Amino acid sequence: MSLSKCSNVDLKSVAMNANTVRLEPSLGEYPTLRRDLVECSCSVLTLSMVKRMGKMTNTVWLFGNPKNPLHQLEPGLEQLLDMYYKDMRCYSQRELSALRWPSGKPSVWFLQAAHMFFSIKNSWAMETGRENWRGLFHRITKGQKYLFEGDMILDSLEAIEKRRLRLGLPEILITGLSPILDVALLQIESLARLRGMSLNHHLFTSPSLRKPLLDCWDFFIPVRKKKTDGSYSVLDEDDEPGVLHGYPHLMAHYLNRCPFHNLIRFDEELRTAALNTIWGRDWPAIGDLPKEV
């Protein structure tokens, strides 16, 4: 709870009855006024899962929970962090504008921290106090002052979850329980959208795809753009060189042809799942498939 909301709070009473938020690994427990906290068990993989129960987690992992499979970085995510690990001077003015969230000012702190802690796997700066964890949550909450540090931590998680929902990213990518990595990926999503692309891979559910399209950072899903008549289409072929500058031409060509169509054509399991009528009454049945497919 921020200072503006708790000016009349009896601090002595709160100190005796407050719940605590645990910051891992071994960074202490901090009081909070919230009463809806729940122990984050191994079966709880995302913040969204906790919130669907009407609760809030009491444990936050700065460097990811080693028991959470969604926090195990695959090569594709590490390549993403390596790609976007740059100095502020390397970004254009348009890109800096996309990096205003969460602090309100352009910053690459989270991108660099995620690269250090998750790609290089060097966490000594935070563990030894060289980097203060409070500064991390201070940035996410835009400098808001709190009486209790536990409230600052939980409000930061709420801000991350709100941003995830706004950008439409799946909870298996932004778990909400690993703030440094979550914010870095949300910033990468903002930068990717400047090129008309997205990290969103929730359509790709076939088990034959390993963490779909994230085995290589080049595989983004192209965002459709709105036409003057109100319909949507993928990026025009003429726009490819400008929008996908820096990407291999053949890969850019493949991406702009909407990879889902190619996958569903050749992956029988994915095609069966996509055409299952449980998704909606007007969903096409398998028997309605064109002969050429």
From Swiss-Prot:
The keyword Protease is assigned to this record: no
Keywords, ordered alphabetically: Host cytoplasm, Host cytoplasmic vesicle, Host G2/M cell cycle arrest by virus, Host-virus interaction, Inhibition of host innate immune response by virus, Inhibition of host interferon signaling pathway by virus, Inhibition of host RIG-I by virus, Inhibition of host RLR pathway by virus, Inhibition of host STAT2 by virus, Inhibition of host TBK1 by virus, Inhibition of host TLR pathway by virus, Interferon antiviral system evasion, Modulation of host cell cycle by virus, Viral immunoevasion
Residue ranges, annotated region (Involved in inclusion bodies formation): 66-69
Major location (coarse): host cell
Region (Essential for inhibition of IFN-beta activation and interaction with host TBK1): 21-29
GO cellular component: host cell cytoplasmic vesicle
Disulfide bonds: none
Site annotation Essential for suppression of TBK1/IRF3-mediated IFN response: residues: 21, 23
Record region (Interaction with host TNIP2): 148-220
GO BP of this protein: symbiont-mediated arrest of host cell cycle during G2/M transition; symbiont-mediated suppression of host cytoplasmic pattern recognition receptor signaling pathway via inhibition of RIG-I activity; symbiont-mediated suppression of host cytoplasmic pattern recognition receptor signaling pathway via inhibition of TBK1 activity; symbiont-mediated suppression of host JAK-STAT cascade via inhibition of STAT2 activity; symbiont-mediated suppression of host toll-like receptor signaling pathway; symbiont-mediated suppression of host type I interferon-mediated signaling pathway
Subcellular location: Host cytoplasm; Host cytoplasmic vesicle
Similarity section: Belongs to the Bandavirus NS-S protein family.
Subunit details: Interacts with the host E3 ubiquitin ligase TRIM25; this interaction sequesters TRIM25 in NSs-induced cytoplasmic inclusion bodies. Interacts with the host E3 ubiquitin ligase RIGI; this interaction sequesters RIGI in NSs-induced cytoplasmic inclusion bodies. Interacts with the host E3 ubiquitin ligase TBK1 (via N-terminus); this interaction sequesters TBK1 in NSs-induced cytoplasmic inclusion bodies and inhibits TBK1 phosphorylation. NSs does not interact with IKBKE/IKKE or IRF3. Interacts with host IRF7; this interaction sequesters IRF7 in NSs-induced cytoplasmic inclusion bodies.
Function: Sequesters host STAT2 into viral inclusion bodies. Impairs IFN-stimulated phosphorylation and nuclear translocation of host STAT2, thereby suppressing type-I IFN antiviral signaling. Sequesters host TRIM25, RIGI, TBK1/IKK complex components (TBK1, IKBKE/IKKE, and IRF3) and IRF7 into viral inclusion bodies, thereby inhibiting the IFN responses. Inhibits TRIM25-mediated ubiquitination of the RIGI. The sequestration of IKBKE/IKKE, and IRF3 occurs via the interaction with TBK1. Sequestration and inhibition of host TBK1 probably participates to the cytokine storm induced by the virus.
Record-given protein name: Non-structural protein NS-S
